[in-house]
C-alpha cells in the first residue's frame, strides 16, 4: 500500500501526501508551487480560467486532455502528468499559440488568457489547422469578459503550426510510463485529520473499501463532487478516487439479436462516448456535444452522470428510453440493474453500500426506429437543462408499433411515461396523435418551479415537445414508407 500520490507537473516528479492530497489542484499549483499562471475565477468549472492539460497512461503513451483544475482534487491525479501554462513555453519563448494571441490582440486584462492558451494548445497538439467553427467549439468552456471572442478566434486561425512542437516530443512519455506502470500496481491509502483517501488498484479492493466504509464518496471525474466540495461545503470523511481502475475505461460493442449494444466502462468519459457514438447515432452525438464544455466532457463520465441522480441530468433520458442496464459490482460479484429501476427516489440509487457502477449497457437505435433526444436550456452549451426528453417510436406502415417515452425535469427523478406509451401503441403516426399524446404527457407529470423554469413552462414543454417531434420526424417517416 502506498501513502503518497505520484504526480508529475511540467515534467517534474512530485510525491504528495498529508493535507495537500485533499486540496483542489488549483490551490496546490498556485500556493504550494507558485504556478500562478493557472487562474481561478468561478471554482465550479464554468469559465475555463484554470484549464490545464492532464496526461494519463494510454498504452505506451500518455493521452493529454484539457480539464478544469479548479474542480479536480490532488487525490484524483495519482499516476498522471499535469501541464500548466508555464509548461507550454517553447525553450523559454512564447509558443505559436501565445505568439498568435499577442499578434491578434487576443488579451486585454489577461485573466482568462492562460486558460484560452492551454485549451488552444491542446486543440492544436495534433498539428492540424482548425476552422473558426472548430476553434469556437473547442473554446466553449472558456469565458472572456473583456477582449471579446473575435480576436481570440482570429488568433486560433493564425497559429503558425510549422513552429509547433508536440507535447509528446517536449515531454517524452518513456520515463512517466515506466514510473506509472510500477506505481499503478499498488493501492494508495492516505489519512489526514480524520479524513481517509483510498485510490484502489483494482475493483475488488474498491468494493472491499466501500463495504468497510459505506459512507465513502466515490470520485470519478469529480465534476459534480468537486463542485459540492468547493461550493456546497461537502467534506467527506472517506473518499475513493477511481482514477487507477484502468479496466473500466473501454467501450466495446456486442450484438443482441439485430441490435448493437455498447458496453461502456464506469470510467469512460463523456468525450470518449461522444467520439464513439459520432458515427453510430446522430441524436446521441448531439446530446453529448451540448453537454457542458470540452473540459467537462474530458473529465466527467457517464457513470458519474447516472450516479449523481439529478432529475435534469442529460444522459438518463436516453438510457431510460433505450432500455439501458447498469452493471454494479460489489463484494459478492456483479449484477445488472435496469436503468428504469435505478432511481428509488430523489438522489436515491438502487446500489448496495459496497457497490459501484462498473459498466453501462446501452442498446443503440435500430434503423427502423425514430429516436429524438431533447435538451431544453437557456443557452446551447455549458448550461444545465430545464427539461429533457427522449422519444423512441417504431412506426410500421403509418402505425406506431412500439413507444418508449422518457422525461427529465418534471419530477424528483427522470421518468418513463407509461400512460403516453400505452396510448401511442397501435395509433396512426399523425400530428393529431402526437398532440393527444402531449396532453396525456402533461397530465402524467408534476414539475416544480425553480431557477431554470417555472412549473407552467415545464408543463407546456411536456405537452408541446410531441408536436415538435412530429414535425421533425414525419417527413423522414413518409420518405421511408
Ligand atoms: C460546468 C459544469 C457543466 C455541467 N454540464 C452538465 C450538462 O450539460 N449536463 C449534465 O447532465 N451534467 C452537467 N454537469 C454535471 C456533471 O459534469 C455530470 O453529472 C458528470 O457526468 C459527472 O461525472 P463525474 O465522473 O465527474 O462524476 P463525479 O463528480 O465523480 O461523481 C458524481 C456522483 O456519482 C458518484 N459516482 C461516480 N462514479 C461512480 C461509480 N463508478 N459508481 C457509483 N457512483 C459513482 C459520485 O460518488 C457522485 O455522487 C456539469 C457540471 C459542471 C461543473
Ligand atoms: S476557475 Fe472557472 S472553470 Fe475553473
Ligand atoms: S482578457 Fe479580460 S477576461 Fe478575457
Where are these regions (language model features)?
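Residue-level signal for mature regions of secreted extracellular proteins and peptides
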Residues: 35, 40-43, 63, 102-105, ...
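The −1 position to Zn-ligating cysteines in a subset of zinc-ribbon hairpins
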Residues: 41, 46, 66-69, 81, ...
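Short, contiguous acidic and Ser/Thr-rich linear segments
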Residues: 12-21
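A basic, amphipathic helix-loop patch mediating RNA/tRNA/ribosome contacts
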Residues: 21-52
